[in-house]
C-alpha cells in the first residue's frame, strides 16, 4: 500500500466524542476539511471504548505505546490496538504515515492548545508554525517518568490537539469548530513546508512541564480537599504569591506549599486525571528562538 503524509486519530479516548464526530462528518463530506493537497488517513483510535462510552476498556490507549509494552505479545485490548495501529500506519507499517495528529478534548479550560512530548525538531517546527498561524499555546510535556507511552511518540512527527472545556460524552459545536480549525492549520503548515514557501516565525512560546500536583489525601487515599473555586478554570494563568490552591468542604482554604512564583497551571481538575492523582500540572513559560534545523527535519519527512 502507498504511504500517506498524515494520520489523523480521533477517539483515542472513547468518551471524547467531538473529534470522532468531526471525522464521521468529514468522511461523509470530503470537502469539509481542506487537506491542502496532503494524503490523509483518518481513524478512530479506540472504537471499542467509544462504543462503550468509556475512556478505555482495559488500560489507557494513550499510555500503551511504551516500547516494553509494544514488544509484548497478547495483552490487554489497548496494548493490542497500539500494536495494530503501528503495524499498519507506523513508520515501518503497511501504510506508513510520516505525521500523526492525535485529537483530544478535555474537561479543563485549556482552550485550543497543542501538546508536544519531548523536543523532537520536526514536532517543534510544526507546532511553531501552527502557533504562528492561530496563536495556540504549546504545552511541552517532558521528563515525567510517571507519564509515558503516548501515541504520537511512535511516529516521526506528531502533535496532540487538546480542546476544552467540555464534559466527557458531550458534543459541543465550539469544540468541533476549534478542532477543525486546528487540523486545517496543521495541514496548511505541512503543505507550506513541502512547497518550500514557508515563513518561519523567529520565536516559539512553550509552556514546559515542571511536574504535577495532587489534592491533599488522607490515610485512606481519599481526597481531603478539592481545587479552590478561585483556581478552577484558570488554566494558563500564572500563580501569584499566596494564591489559594485547595479548599475544604466548609470552603476554608487548605494550607499547601506555596507554588513557584509565575509557574503556570494547566489541565486543572481534568476529570480523567483524578485516577492518576493529578489535580493539575505545572509549567514554566519560555520563549525559544527558532532553530533552522527544526524545519529541515520536518521537510525531510515530507519529501
Curated annotation (Swiss-Prot):
The keyword Endoplasmic reticulum does not apply. GO terms for molecular function: aspartoacylase activity; hydrolase activity, acting on ester bonds; zinc ion binding. Keywords: Hydrolase, Metal-binding, Zinc. Binds 1 zinc ion per subunit. Substrate binds at residues 55, 62-63, 162, 273. Its EC number is 3.5.1.15. It catalyses: an N-acyl-L-aspartate + H2O = a carboxylate + L-aspartate. HAMAP family: Aspartoacylase (MF_00704). PANTHER family: ASPARTOACYLASE, SUCCINYLGLUTAMATE DESUCCINYLASE. Belongs to the AspA/AstE family. Aspartoacylase subfamily. This is Probable aspartoacylase. It comes from Synechococcus sp. (strain CC9902).
Amino acid at each position: 500500500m502507498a504511504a500517506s503524509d498524515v494520520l489523523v486519530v480521533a477517539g483515542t479516548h472513547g468518551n471524547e466524542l467531538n473529534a470522532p464526530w468531526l471525522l464521521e462528518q468529514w468522511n461523509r463530506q470530503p470537502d469539509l476539511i481542506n487537506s491542502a493537497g496532503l494524503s490523509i488517513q483518518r481513524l478512530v483510535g479506540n472504537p471499542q471504548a467509544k462504543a462503550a462510552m468509556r475512556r478505555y476498556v482495559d488500560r489507557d490507549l494513550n499510555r500503551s505505546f511504551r516500547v516494553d509494552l509494544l514488544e509484548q505479545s497478547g495483552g490487554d485490548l489497548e496494548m493490542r490496538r497500539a500494536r495494530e495501529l503501528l503495524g499498519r500506519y507506523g513508520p515501518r507499517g503497511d501504510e506508513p504515515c510520516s505525521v500523526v495528529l492525535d485529537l483530544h478534548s478535555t474537561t479543563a479550560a485549556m482552550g485550543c492548545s497543542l501538546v508536544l512530548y519531548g523536543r523532537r525538531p520536526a514536532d517543534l517546527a510544526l507546532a511553531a508554525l501552527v502557533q504562528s498561524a492561530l496563536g495556540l499555546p504549546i504545552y511541552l510535556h517532558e521528563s515525567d517518568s510517571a507519564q509515558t507511552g503516548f501515541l504520537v511518540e511512535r511516529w516521526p512527527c506528531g502533535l496532540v490537539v487538546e480542546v476544552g472545556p467540555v464534559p466527557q460524552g458531550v458534543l459541543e459545536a465550539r469544540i468541533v469548530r476549534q478542532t477543525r480549525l486546528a487540523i486545517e492549520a496543521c495541514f496548511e503548515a505541512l503543505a507550506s513546508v513541502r512547497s518550500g514557501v514557508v515563513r518561519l516565525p523567529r520565536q516559539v512560546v512553550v509552556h514546559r512541564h515542571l511536574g504535577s500536583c495532587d489534592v491533599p489525601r488522607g490515610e485512606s487515599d481519599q481526597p481531603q480537599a478539592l481545587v479552590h473555586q478561585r483556581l478552577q478554570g484558570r488554566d494558563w494563568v500564572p500563580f501569584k504569591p499566596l494564591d489559594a490552591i485547595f479548599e475544604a468542604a466548609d470552603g476554608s482554604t487548605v494550607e499547601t506549599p506555596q507554588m513557584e512564583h509565575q509557574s503556570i497551571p494547566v489541565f486543572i481538575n481534568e476529570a480523567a486525571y483524578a485516577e492518576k492523582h493529578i489535580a493539575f500540572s505545572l509549567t514554566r513559560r519560555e520563549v525559544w528562538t527558532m532553530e533552522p534545523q527544526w524545519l529541515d527535519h520536518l521537510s525531510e519527512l515530507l519529501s
